[in-house]
Amino acid sequence: MALSTEQKTKMWAMLNQTRGQIGLTAYKDYIFGILFYKYLSEKATHWLNGVLRGENWESVYSQDSVKALNYMKKNLGYAIQPNEFFVDWKKAIDTDRFNIGMMTDTFTHFNQQIAFEAKNDFEGIFDGMRFDSADLGANAQARASVMISMIELLSSPEFDLSGSNDTVSDIYEYLVAQFATVLASDMGQYYTPKEISNVMARILTFGREDMEKFSIFDPTVGSGSLLLTTASYMKNSGRRGVIKYYGQEKDATPYRLSRMNLMMHGIEYNDININHADTLESDWPDGVVDGKDTPRMFDAVMANPPYSAHWNNKDREDDPRWREYGVSPKTKADYAFLLHCLYHLEDNGRMAIILPHGVLFRGASEGRIRKALIDKHQIEAIIGFPEKLFLNTPIPVCVVILRKNRIESDVLFVDASKGFEKIKKQNNLRSEDVEKIVDTVIN
């Protein structure tokens, strides 16, 4: 069951009450990390209850610890030793036995027990938490006090993760949105408003909702919201193996958050492949291997890249991602991101990318790239949105829809700049605005 507005408001108020003097920028890493560990603990407990059939995990572990941990790793991708579950921290607090070293030991052991095939999914995922950090307090006692407050907060009924995946994902999505709102300059760039995500996702999946296999790719994955929203419109998204989630992220914080976000939506680690690297540097996934151009292709590609970013465009003319179209200027990487996405699109796939309006009229190399895309009939539609939809920038943006093997030469322009509601300093798309945009594009 989805969280009510009242529950969300209470949750955020409780969180602010417990953080004390810690800045939200630092606090978010601990809240997300500990919440995710709680999720993994409860998932492991649920799995153990099903396989042990009344036996005690500590007893099984004591008989053959290596075998026990390997069995858990084989099934979950990770393993948790006895007495190192989230509830064990809470029990230690309740009996005055807690110390911050318990958490340090837990995460050290967790990192040692990641399955080889799950390394990309779990490795470094808790690195945002430093238990010796001065952000938490001047001494071990002060830092332990902060951790106790967090653990007790996340043990409250408001943060109960024992319900459906919808409840778990709702909690996580709400917190991501709240932190992105409050920390707009820090996190806003990694968060795409839900309404724009829905527009893109519905266009990308229209007529393909029943596909048994579907691969999606976001090369600037941020919090992972575009991947998740796109998948939510696929009828078989709840079945393991149907959808393969690929993404890439340069910055460490969203790299961690995106993996947490996907898994807390119930997606198994072996359906997730998120890479930590600069998308505009060496190509991924696959790309040129042993001198041969062999990019991995996807059914749907979506992106909300940093707008008009600077990049190193030197000696890029022979890179297969840009060779046919040209190289973007070093002060504006917008078309570099677009062409990277197009390069990884299946011949019958669809892509949607959010860009500043400047890509529609700037000249020089960008004008030549734009002309090449139009001459190849690869731009299907351009949707112009109102200003102030995004948390980190007031500028208006557009969504460009592309297909590779398109025959029609026309380009649909949708002016959606007038349909919105104003909420404080931000503009928001209403449900009727989303419907009108989607209907215009797909019909």
List where the protein language model places each region:
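Short alpha-helix immediately C-terminal to the canonical SAM-binding loop
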Residues: 227, 253-257
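Non-catalytic, mostly N-terminal accessory regions of nucleic-acid modification and defense proteins
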Residues: 1-204, 208, 270-279, 384-387, ...
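A conserved structural/catalytic subdomain of Rossmann-like adenosyl-cofactor enzymes
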Residues: 2, 281-282, 286-443
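Conserved SAM-binding motif I beta-strand of class I
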Residues: 244-249
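S-adenosyl-L-methionine
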Residues: 257-293
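Conserved class I S-adenosyl-L-methionine
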Residues: 211-220
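Conserved SAM-binding loop of SAM-dependent methyltransferases across substrates and taxa
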Residues: 223-240
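Conserved hydrophobic/aromatic pocket- or pore-lining residues that grip, position, or stack substrates
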Residues: 171, 200, 219-222, 230, ...
